Amino acid sequence: MLGFAAIGVLASPSFAQHEGHAGMSDMPADTIATAPTTPTRTVSDSAAIADSLLSACKPHIGHSIDAYASCLGDGIAALSSAGNIALAMGTLDRIVHSDPSLILIGHPLAHALGYAVRSTPVTATRLLSECDDRYQSGCYHGILQRYFDARMGLPLAQSVLLAPCDGLRGTREQFRLFDCLHGVGHGLMMYHRYDANASLKDCDRLASDWDQRSCYSGVFMENNMGAHMQMFADEQLGMHRHSMPGPSAVLFKPNDLNYPCNATPARYRRECYELQADLILPAVKQDYRKAGAACDSAGNADLVRECYIGLGRNASGAAAFQYAGIKKRCDQVSPAGVPFCYEGAVRHLAYAPSELSRGVAFCKSLPEGDGRSRCWDGVGLQVGGFFSDSTSRQRACRSELESDVAACVEGAGVARTVPARDRP
């Protein structure tokens, strides 16, 4: 999945850092209000709703793509806010099918429909269960952001922190649990108004190292989204319904491409560097050669690797999941970094169980060698996060080449007695 880390220096919390939700913490009712947990409409209505939304929102294209997408997002969010989450997701599917150009903003749109859903410790798990892993699990992330955002300024009891995800434990599909814990990280950044240090401390209140690291990934995804809005004027991220960081929040330094990773405690640094490419690439105008050089300056070999993995994830997104575009970007970095770039790409291609075949096909398109082996190791890491039992992991690692299988099962931790993932 993704990994992130703490920010070394942030301004003290203030409502200025949470400009986009001014007044929300002054709404006590939001802390006890919830969307209905029983849908009132069925997914079969999605086609008609999608057609209606597309017709109503098309005129906004003349103003900007952001206005067009925001119009669609508002319409879908109106469905989910009323408890019709599956219908909202189905409508998003139909919209993307009708206008494939929107696939690149499918995650922000799913995030927006999730953020529209209010929940309480009693209802959060039931509402989250209506989401799934489509669109890089944006629905989960949005619901959890709203859950914590609504509680800004209130004490965060341990029961409130744990309630959303504890109901998802004990299943074979542990990816749902990862998604929830990752979403908690997003939400904690809302709660703490972009103070990553405070957010990470709350992540450390979770039960296990795996839980905590899954949470870190959400904290620093949110940090980097805030940095994009703050430094690079990325309007598209507004569809996530993120608050806008205030000018006093130091989320990134363009003259120091290793910040904030080089200013964070060692425990969080690996997660940070896995996401640092999200900040490096816009700073170097998407020049993968220059971005690779920035990764090389991370110092520690493990951190350099994580940075290259992040470059691969970005390559997959920038190429709209097209294999040729991924290879073109990854092949610009140093020869030692290319295999790890491929690993990052496949972990993005196969971000969720429903996308596993797409990642496997990418690895099979590569020639035998280090790049292909590292790609299959990346598949294994994903598989280890998707399934908790060895049988399912072995089944997912099938390939015609024994070398593929060996790399995959090693990544999945099939022969180990410890969880395959010690990080998200």
Regions found by a protein language model. Name each.
Residues 9-11, 34:
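Intrinsic disorder/low-complexity segments, especially N-terminal tails and targeting/processing regions
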Residues 1-9:
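Bacterial N-terminal signal peptides
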